[in-house]
């Protein structure tokens, strides 16, 4: 990381102990030698007040279509299947599961997960509590139905945190438990958001960030991001400097 935009909240490293205590109920069990699935994936989608109805639909439909895409399904089948859950997040107490844990291993189960996403209704809007979103995603991983070789949180958003615990503290605590956090930064309103996500949000083994200029690019980006996460490698997607996509 070449530079930082600075911390969004007053330095409070002493508070990390308290945050670790808060995370204790969400402790992630290390993956067993004989994992039942290649990956347990939580998709954490921003629905804060900066995301309008059209942008909300672009995100949800983009994810649904990705799980109906033949390339994504082929990748999932090649690793023996994944467990996936999608949640929405905005303010401190506003995180909601849209599509609960689903074992996706073929086209039929991919379509079933897509149907759950399309059946969901917007749960909230509000401020941008990235730290609380990561806490909720960590709690969801604790309840994953199968042992997984990798545990990944894929968080997407269009703004910096403006309330709640510092994202980097929550990230560090989750990374210490073996959870990788990847990001998709939407630069429509904050062109520097990629730097913030790189410094404050993503982390862990093989972590990467993909950035797009606007919500119209989301569907293509999430498909490529899923392919990278499923195969446990970062794609070169056109201009991919810490994850840039034109």
What is the role of each PLM region?
Residues 1-11:
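N-terminal secretory signal peptides that target proteins for export/translocation
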Residues 36-100, 103-104, 111-156, 182-193, ...:
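Von Willebrand factor
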Residues 79-116, 193-199:
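Short beta-strand-loop
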Residues 125-176, 227, 246:
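Exposed acidic/Ser/Thr-rich ligand/metal-binding surfaces
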């Amino acid at each position: 990381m070449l530079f930082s935009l600075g911390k969004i909240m007053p330095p409070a490293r002493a508070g990390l102990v308290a945050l670790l205590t808060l995370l204790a109920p969400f402790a992630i069990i290390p993956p067993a030698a004989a994992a039942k699935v290649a990956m347990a994936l939580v998709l954490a989608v921003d629905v804060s007040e900066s995301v309008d109805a059209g942008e909300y639909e672009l995100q949800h439909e983009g994810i649904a279509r990705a799980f109906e895409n033949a390339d994504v399904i082929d990748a999932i089948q090649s690793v023996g299947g994944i467990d996936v859950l999608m949640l929405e997040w905005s303010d401190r107490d506003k995180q909601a599961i849209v599509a609960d844990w689903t074992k996706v291993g073929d086209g039929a189960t991919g379509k079933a997960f897509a149907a759950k996403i399309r059946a969901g209704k917007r749960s909230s809007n509000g401020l941008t509590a990235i730290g609380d979103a990561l806490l909720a995603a960590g709690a969801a991983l604790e309840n994953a139905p199968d042992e997984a070789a990798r545990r990944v949180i894929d968080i997407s958003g269009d703004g910096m945190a403006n309330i709640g615990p510092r994202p980097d503290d929550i990230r560090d605590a989750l990374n210490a438990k073996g959870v990788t956090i990847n990001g998709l930064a939407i630069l429509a309103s904050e062109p520097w958001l990629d730097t913030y996500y790189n410094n404050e949000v993503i982390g862990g083994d093989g972590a990467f960030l993909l950035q797009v200029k606007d919500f119209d690019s989301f569907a293509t980006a999430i498909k490529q991001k899923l392919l990278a996460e499923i195969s446990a490698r970062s794609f070169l997607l056109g201009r991919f400097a810490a994850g840039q996509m034109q």
